[in-house]
UniProtKB/Swiss-Prot annotation:
The keyword Ribosomal protein applies. Transmembrane segments: none annotated. One of its GO terms (biological process) is translation. Keywords: Ribonucleoprotein, Ribosomal protein, RNA-binding, rRNA-binding. It comes from the Bacteria. The keyword Iron-sulfur does not apply. Pfam families: Ribosomal_L18p. This is Large ribosomal subunit protein uL18. One of its GO terms (cellular component) is cytosolic large ribosomal subunit. This is one of the proteins that bind and probably mediate the attachment of the 5S RNA into the large ribosomal subunit, where it forms part of the central protuberance. InterPro entries: Ribosomal_uL18_bac-type, Ribosomal_uL18_bac/euk. The gene is rplR.
Length: 120
C-alpha cells in the first residue's frame, strides 16, 4: 500500500474507534464518497446489520438529474436516508464521516439528514 493509503486507512480506523466509545448503543450513519457518487447507510453495530441505506445511484435520484458528484446529490441522499431511517424507528445516530473532512458533500449530506429528522 502507498503511504497515502496507509494514512487514510489509519485515519478511518481512528475515527471508527472514537465513535464506538461514544456511541452508547446508537446506530452509526456511515458515509462513503467516491469521485462520481456518494453512499450512506445507517448501521446497527451491535447486531451487525444495515437499517437503512441510500446512494446517488438510485433510480429516483438519477432521474432527478443529479450526477452524484455534487452537493445537490449529497443533500438528496441525506434526505432520503433520513426518511428511511425514521421510518425504521431510528431517530438518533452517530455520524461516521469515514475519515473524510466534514466539508462539501459530506457536510451537505449530514445537514440534510438533520433537517429530515435524524439527530446527531
Amino acid at each position: 500500500m502507498s503511504k497515502l493509503n496507509v494514512t487514510n486507512a489509519r485515519r478511518k480506523t481512528r475515527v471508527r474507534i472514537a465513535l464506538r466509545r461514544t456511541a452508547n448503543g446508537r446506530p452509526r450513519l456511515s458515509v462513503f464518497r467516491s469521485s462520481k457518487h456518494i453512499y450512506a447507510q445507517v448501521i446497527d453495530d451491535l447486531k451487525g446489520e444495515t437499517l437503512a441505506s441510500a446512494s446517488s445511484l438510485e433510480k429516483s435520484l438519477r432521474d432527478a438529474g443529479n450526477t452524484g458528484a455534487n452537493i445537490d446529490a449529497a443533500k438528496a441522499v441525506g434526505k432520503l436516508l433520513a426518511e428511511r431511517a425514521v421510518q425504521q424507528g431510528v431517530k438518533e445516530v452517530v455520524f461516521d464521516r469515514g475519515g473524510y473532512l466534514y466539508h462539501g458533500r459530506v457536510k451537505a449530506l449530514a445537514d440534510a439528514a438533520r433537517e429530515s429528522g435524524l439527530s446527531f
